[in-house]
Amino acid sequence: MDSQETKVFENVKQENPDEKKPKVEEPDSQNNASTQSQQKFLDFQLSWCPESERKTTKYHLLKFHSNKAIDPSKSFVPPIKMQRRDPNAPSSSNGEQNAEQGSSSNVNIASIAPYGGAQNMKQNAFKRKTRQVVKVDPQARRLQEEELSPWIMEDFEGKNTWVSTMEGGQSSAYVLFMFSENGFKVIPTDRFYRFNQRNNFQTLSIDEAEAKMNKKTPIPRWFMKKESEENLAEAGSASPMYKLKTVPNARPVTGPRASGSDDELDYDEEFADDEEAPIMEGNEEDNKKLKDKIKKEMLTANLFGEADQDVDLEEENDRQMSREGKKLQRYLKLLEKNLAYESDEEDEDPYASSHDASSEEEVLQEEEELQKREEKLKSRFSANASKTNTPRPLERTPSSVSPVKASSQLQSPNTSIQIRPQEQLINKPGYIILRLSSEKLSRFANDFPRMVPSMGSTETSVGDQVEVVGDTTNVPIDDSNLITEAEVMKALRAGPISIKDLVHLFQRKIRADNRNRLGIQKIIRKVARFENKLLVLKNY
């Protein structure tokens, strides 16, 4: 086959006999007119590119890999530049600076051994020196070295950047058909490139990426893509945004905490496990008490012996005293007709019921009823004592006698009390034994349920029979536990004091005698006044 001129017959299209088309007759085929009338062919002459032209000129084919039609003359900003370079390499100006810095790089001399490579030579003295050599086609190696730096096409603004990738290889062959005078000219292509558009966002170099990874702070996956958005956010308003909301009933959450509130919750946890420990035998209540005791001992063990029972008793006394103080505060509010004592009630439970916070009218009614009951009790007691002029002992067992605590001692000679030998053990100062019938005792307990504990009596059975002989109307009352004006004035001279602290000072006397509850209120009204929610001594 001649490389200069080669005739190739190509079947272009078979003519349909039904269609009316002009007949084309070749000058050399006049004798075979009958055969050519059935089938018609078009001859195209293909001429191969001469060898001399192939040595001087090489033809490369490029293709833009995109869904859209790419026209560099329209979409690219001129001038368009196409060159071979590393896509990750910096620009020319940065490259010159890096070259200058690389020439003056500091080398750690301490890492270089003084004897050079003598140690390695000593180790490899008896090792056979071998080298593996692989023969590679020089043309293929040259092609590989050239393609290490791909073609990069970019416009003037740098918005359109396309990176080439060679397709095919040594085994592929592509040709181009170019129009010529007599037909087509066949030109073989040396390489076929596919151009892919590079991402618009910035990427980090190897050194920069390694520096980012060495930091302990977490790095998001697409932080380079979001860098521009963060810059825009920083440019905007950096003031924090606050939101307000309305609350239906805003009350302080803080309040007095009960003792043992920090302990663990008491609950029973059961697991349906076949491998669990066997169930403890014995009474369940005893086992539960034992567990509670062990739990308390474990909690108190952390105090290292600092726990004191007296401290717990003092806290309980303060807690009881606070109830008395609340009553006193209500009276003082009624006296001053203002809310000067609201701050002293900060320790109240915000979730307390309305029954605990009674109104002022209820407090006054309660005190009036208390005074009436005391008067009735005194009158009935004096009447019963006057009727019994002669001793009338009753049979009873020693266990039926129970002591009754009184706030005053009987010192009148007109009163005679029969005391049996078994009762001498409980006849102490501050105690008397009254001999009353069971009917009177039951009637007294039913009519005055609150006065019995107020007078200091203990629990007694209905069958107890106590007899009082003589007249008890002239029995003097012990006023040693009453609070006096001098004591209150002495406490106020030390300085301004709150209601709670003042009640705490007279705590023992208020418990000893119930008359101090109303007495201290009258004394405070007389000798004290309020200033900045504190009690101050009046100027006489």
From Swiss-Prot:
Q: Where is the composition biased (Basic and acidic residues)?
A: 1-26
Bias category Polar residues: which stretches? 29-39, 89-106, 381-416
Q: Which processes are annotated in GO (biological process)?
A: positive regulation of transcription elongation by RNA polymerase II; transcription initiation at RNA polymerase II promoter
According to the UniProt record, one GO cellular component term is:
transcription factor TFIIF complex
Could you name the domain of life of the organism this protein comes from?
Answer: Eukaryota
PTM-bearing positions, type Phosphoserine? 259, 261, 399
Renumbered residue ranges of the record's region Disordered: 1-39, 70-106, 341-416
Feature: compositional bias, Acidic residues: 359-369
- PANTHER family in the cross-refs: GENERAL TRANSCRIPTION FACTOR IIF SUBUNIT 1 (PTHR13011:SF0), TFIIF-ALPHA (PTHR13011)
| Name this polypeptide is given | Transcription initiation factor IIF subunit alpha
Organism, by scientific name, is: Schizosaccharomyces pombe (strain 972 / ATCC 24843)
